[in-house]
Amino acid sequence: MSTSPAARPTSNAHLLGWVDEMAKLCKPDRVYWCDGSEAEKKRLTDDAVAAKVLIPLDQQKWPGCHYHHSNSSDVARVEHLTFICTPTKEQAGPTNNWMEPKEAYRKLGAIFDGSMKGRTMYVVPYVMGPSTSPFAKVGIEITDSVYVALNMGIMARMGKVALDRLGDSDEFNRGLHSVADCNPERRFICHFPQDNTIWSVGSGYGGNALLGKKCLALRIASYLAKNEGWLAEHMLILEAESPTGEKQYVAAAFPSACGKTNFAMMIPPAAFPGWKIRTVGDDISWMRVGEDGRLWAVNPENGYFGVAPGTNRKTNPNAMDSVRKDTIFTNVARTPDGDIWWEGMDHEAPAELIDWKGQPWKKGSTEKAAHPNSRFTAPAKNNPAISPLVDDPKGVPISAIIFGGRRSTTVPLVLEAFNWTHGVYLGSTMGSETTAAATGQVGVVRRDPMAMLPFIGYDCGSYLQHWLDMQSRIPNPPKIFLVNWFRKSAEGKFLWPGYGDNMRVLKWMLDRAAGRAPAQETLLGYTPGDAGLDLHGLDVSKDAIAAATRIDLGEWEQELESQSEWFEKLGKTLPRPLALQRELLLERVRAARKVK
């Protein structure tokens, strides 16, 4: 077994001992330590092209861009094979899959044993967060996938910078990953919060294999945050600059397919001249209390791992600019001459394509050319609207926290919480509608507290209690809001135009955070009222706006019944203040119905 480059570029005994131990288990032919340099990126890319792991795109149209298609059984996160391995099942809680740690190490160890024979073991040191920030966390991912190593080079600050930050410390996340035989029957993603360790085997897909992303930055980090008194959240961070030059920062949590990246990269409508929205982050926020008593946030990532289908110049021009160079496209469709396409792109599909499975595809086919979860991995620095503070080690001060799900009924366009506890209640009960295929029942609400349901690294009730406990740590807390861009008319049409016009709602929230906008008190929270939103230049009827902001008491009685079932699922660790918030709202709704 050989080791390169420069043999071992660290003298950290903790790290060297662990790498040796993992090499002994996985038995690679060669160990390669990544340094994060441009020369290395070119060399690894050439290796990946030679091995047909990557296919170069037309370098005139897509400079520095490459295409990858995964195994057809390996296209998304696998929640049912994702485990939290805590000493007791209660510590993982009722919303996570649990495996006893010794059993998990034994079970996965048997799969890892010899899994890298004939392969290179890449040692990928990386930092989540600006490398000089007190927020920063170091991880080391060992992987047998050059695709993973190259993606980690985009998504995190990778290589020498991480080893320099680590020094001789033992405080690093130990991540072991092998594609192994990519067998769904031998696929496990296991998190060991007490050991600051992640073992992932049998998948090469982003969320399962890029261990810095969901695994460390949310599941492990949420556990560390609970113990250390901060928040690791599934939230975008955006900077809003007014025409007068005032800058405010918000963090927003939306579940998948609810427009997080679009909101983070929003372009204000023509009716808002002089306003600028810049991206600090599009997916993850780490937040700590600053010396001034405010909540400060950093984006731990260094790139965007975005869903391609539906992304176009209308929905997200900044994302389209971000992927123009040095991007890896996974499971989109491509043309034989090195162009790419996906459903929802600005132009119609070409007559013939190679689909995401590598098969010929003709226009008019009922099959999707690009996989619905096909992705782009793009460097954050490509974003023309990136915030200049994206690498600031202090982070940015958060004025508002926004929660939002996808609800066709019930939840109005925007609400401001009465207080922190009420805001945590709104976040704890947020969710999105699904179709229950077995019953054909449409509109079943999948609760997704703070958009974190698949990513909480410990018991959900304890996580919500941590949110409540944070109030005493934040002398100057941000205001909390709930939004719903997705309410529909009786005919099934969206009532609110969304996209850039969400700026109108954002402006009201920013003004409320600054203490300069009026609001109307309702039984659900504060709302803008009839005149609170700036609607000039908006081609939407007054009736549609009224319907988007309406509070229907009958719908809320049903909603509170559904919330009761959700709270029962959380069991005995559900914080009593959240149950009380539900009970108080139910009383307000019933009292209002009697008055009516």
Curated annotation (Swiss-Prot):
Annotated compartments: Cytoplasm
Keywords: Cytoplasm, Decarboxylase, Gluconeogenesis, GTP-binding, Lyase, Manganese, Metal-binding, Nucleotide-binding
Cofactor note: Binds 1 Mn(2+) ion per subunit.
Binding-site residues for Mn(2+), renumbered to this chain: 214, 234, 283
UniProt xrefs under SUPFAM superfamilies: PEP carboxykinase N-terminal domain (SSF68923), PEP carboxykinase-like (SSF53795)
Record bears the keyword Nucleotide-binding: yes
Protein origin, superkingdom: Bacteria
An example molecular function term from Gene Ontology annotations: manganese ion binding
Active site (catalytic residues): 258
GO terms for biological process, alphabetical: cellular response to glucose stimulus; gluconeogenesis; glycerol biosynthetic process from pyruvate; oxaloacetate metabolic process; propionate catabolic process; response to lipid; response to starvation
Pfam families: PEPCK_GTP (PF00821), PEPCK_N (PF17297)
Catalytic reactions on record: oxaloacetate + GTP = phosphoenolpyruvate + GDP + CO2
Keyword match Transport: no
Binding-site list for GTP: 257-262, 375, 406, 499-502
Annotated EC: 4.1.1.32
Primary location class: cytoplasm
Family of this protein: Belongs to the phosphoenolpyruvate carboxykinase [GTP] family.
Record function comment: Catalyzes the conversion of oxaloacetate (OAA) to phosphoenolpyruvate (PEP), the rate-limiting step in the metabolic pathway that produces glucose from lactate and other precursors derived from the citric acid cycle.
Assembly and binders: Monomer.
PANTHER family, per database record: PHOSPHOENOLPYRUVATE CARBOXYKINASE, PHOSPHOENOLPYRUVATE CARBOXYKINASE [GTP]-RELATED
Protein name: Phosphoenolpyruvate carboxykinase [GTP]
